[in-house]
Amino acid sequence: PSASNSKDTTGANNDANMTAAQGTFYLQAGAFPGAPIRGAAGCCLAPYDIPNAHTFGYDVVSNRSKVAAYRAPGAPIGAYAVECVLDEVAEALKMCPLEFRLKNAAKEGTKAVHGPTYPVMGYVETLEACLSHPHYKAPLKKLQGRGYASGFWFNAGGESSAQVNITEDGNVVVTTGHPDIGGSRASIANITAELLGINVNRVSVLIGDTATIGFSNLTGGSRVLFASALVVTESTNQVIDILKDRASKIWNIDKEAIEWENGEARPAGDNAGKFKPLTLVELAEQATPTGGPIGAGHQVNTVGAEGGFATHICDVEVD
C-alpha cells in the first residue's frame, strides 16, 4: 500500500469514442525509493483502446516506513483514478458506464498504452458477462447506488525449478522453490495428482531452499503458479514416462505399447498383450529391481505470460 495523489484527464467525442487520456501519479515510497509507479502508470489505461495516451509516475520519497508490495502493487491506485473519471465521462454522454467501457475496450490486436500489442485476451468477455448478469439488471432500492470498475495486471513468467519423486509406498513428494503465499501448494498438489491419476491426498508439496532445489525466481502472485505449474507438469510427465518404462520391463514389451491412465500402467490396446494393470503403488514396490528410485526434475525460464483483466459490479447503500 502506498499513499498517493492521482490526476487523470480523459476525453471522448459525441460518438462515445475515447480520443485521449493523460494520467499523472504521485506515489509515496517511504524512506527509500521504490514506489509502485509502474503498476499505477502501466495498468491504469491497459483495458482500453485509446489513440492518444500518456501516463507518468513520480516516486516520492518521504520520512516514513518503506512501502512494499501487497497485491498488484500500484495498479488499484491508478485504476481507481481512471475508472472514476470514466464514470463521469459516461454520465456526461448519458450512457451506461459498462456500455461505454465496452465500446472502448481493448481487443486482440489493440496496441496497449503500456507498449505491447495484445494477443487473444478476455477484457470484452468480462464486460459482456457483467452486462448479462442478473446483478446488472436488478432494481436498486432507496439510497442505493451501483458502481462499475475494471482492472488489469501484467503477470509474469521467469525461472522455476521442481522435483517430483515417488516414495516406496507409492506416494508422491513434489519439491519447488516457491514459498506459498496464496494456496500454490494446494494447486501444485492438485496438478500433480490429476496428471498421475491419483488422489490428491497422496501428494505432498515441499518448499525447497537453494541447497535442495534449483534456482527459482521471486514468488509473486502474478507468476508463481503459472511458472511452477509448467515446471511441475513437465517433471510429472517425465515421471509418468519412467513408470511406463518400468512397466515395460515387468511385462517385457515396448514402452510405446503402454499407456498411463487413472493411476495405472495399461497395455495400449489388444495388440500390446493381455496384462493386469500395474498401479502406482505396485510399480513403486518394484522400483529397485526395475531400475531404482523413481523421480524427475525440471527447470525452465517460463515465457508467454499474458495480462489479466477483471470487471466488478458493486452496490452500496447509505443509511
What are the residue ranges of the model-derived segments?
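Cofactor-centric catalytic regions
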Residues: 1-52, 60, 81-84, 91-93, ...
